[in-house]
C-alpha cells in the first residue's frame, strides 16, 4: 500500500446536477497509510469551454472560461496516517451555461483538488466533473405557441416539353417542444403537373455550430418519417407525429463558442423541393391546451392554410387548365418511421447533399432557411468546415448530462397518425414516467 491510499472529491448528497446560482458543497476525502508532509492542499471549482478543429481532439484551438475559484484547505504541515476530510463550498455563477459535450468541443464544469508536496516528492491531484443544467423555459420565446408554417413552389419540366409545378407547405402545431413530447406535422402537397411526385420525407435535424478558427457545423438526423408520393393533378395532405427524444436544449446561453439549433425539414426528391422549419427544444413546456390528435380525415386541423400562387405563369396556368380539376385533398399514408437509437456507434448510410459552407463572421443564424446540411440516418455525424471538400463522418455520440439521459429513450417510433386515430384519440404526447 502507498502513502496516499485514497484521494477523492465527494459532493454533498451525491449530487451531480446543479442549477446556475446554486451553492456547490462537498469535501475532499484523504486516506493515508503513512505520514504525508505537504506545502498546501487546495480545491478549485471551474467551468470552461473548448473547441477543436478535429473530431475527438482534446487540443483546443479556442477556449473560454466561465468561472475559476480556488480555496486553500490546509497550509504547510504534515498529515498523520488515517482518514482526513476537508469540506468546501462554492457559489456557482448565475450565468454559467448548461453542460455539453460533442465531437468538436465541450462545456465542462469540474472540481479539482491538489496536494502540493515538498520538493522531489510527487504531487497528488484528483478531479470530479459535475453538470450544470440551466432550464430553457419555452414560454420565454416570442410566438412559441404559434403554428410553424413554411411553403415553397417548385417549377419543373417533364416529358421534354411539358411544365408543371408542385406547391409544398409544411407546418407543426408548435414552435417548441420538450423531451417526450409529440411533434405533430402536417404537409400539404399540390401537384400541378401530369407527373407523380417522389415520396415526401420529414426529418428532425440537429445542427451544432462550433466556433473554432472558422465555424464548423455538425448536423445529424434525429428522426425521420417517410410518406408516399402524390399522384398527378392531385392535392394531398400528410399528417404525422415524431416523438422528441432526449436532446440537449436549443442554444446554449452564456456560451459564445457552441450553438445548438433544431430544424424540421420536409422534402421531396422529384421534383426537388424542401422546406425547413426552425424548432426549439427546451425544458419547460409551452403553456397551451393540447390540440386534438384526431381531426377528421381530409379536414384541416387549423394548423395552416395551403399557400397557392395567386397568379401562376401563363404556361403553368395553361397546363393546369388542360389537366383535371383538383378535388378535395387526399390523405397520404406513411411508408417508414425511424428514430435514432441512443449512443450507438454503428455507422449508418450517408446521403450527401453537397453545399458549399457559407463564411460566417458572427454567430450562426438561428433561423436560417436552409443550413448547410448533409443528411444521415443513425449515429453517423457528418459535418462541414469552411474550405473543406465535403462532409466528414464521425462516430461520436452527444454525451448528455444525467438530467437528460434519465428520460426513457424512444427505441420505437410513436404511433402514426392513422394508428393514433384508431386508438380512440388517446394523446400519445405524455412525458415518459408521468
From Swiss-Prot:
Belongs to the arrestin family. The PPxY motifs mediate interaction with WW domain-containing ubiquitin-protein ligases. It comes from the Eukaryota. Its main location: membrane. GO terms for biological process: extracellular transport; extracellular vesicle biogenesis; negative regulation of Notch signaling pathway; protein transport; protein ubiquitination; ubiquitin-dependent protein catabolic process. It comes from Rattus norvegicus. The lineage of its organism: Eukaryota, Metazoa, Chordata, Craniata, Vertebrata. It holds the Pfam family Arrestin_C. InterPro entries: Arrestin-like_C (IPR014752), Arrestin-like_N (IPR011021), Arrestin_C-like (IPR011022), Arrestin_domain-protein (IPR050357), Ig_E-set (IPR014756). Disulfide bonds: none annotated. SUPFAM superfamilies: E set domains. Residues 295-345 are annotated as: Disordered. GO terms for molecular function: arrestin family protein binding; identical protein binding; ubiquitin protein ligase binding; ubiquitin-like ligase-substrate adaptor activity. It is found in: Cell membrane. A motif (PPxY motif 2) lies at residues 414-417. The keyword Membrane applies. Interacts (via PPxY motifs) with ITCH (via WW domains); the interaction is direct and participates in the recruitment of the ubiquitin-protein ligase ITCH to the NOTCH1 receptor. Interacts with ARRB1 and ARRB2; the interaction is direct. Interacts with TSG101; may recruit TSG101 to the plasma membrane. Interacts (via PPxY motifs) with WWP2 (via WW domains); ubiquitinates ARRDC1. Interacts with SLC11A2; controls the incorporation of SLC11A2 into extracellular vesicles through an ubiquitination-dependent mechanism. Interacts with WWP1 (via WW domains). Interacts with NEDD4 (via WW domains). This is Arrestin domain-containing protein 1. GO terms for cellular component: cytoplasm; cytoplasmic vesicle; extracellular vesicle; plasma membrane.
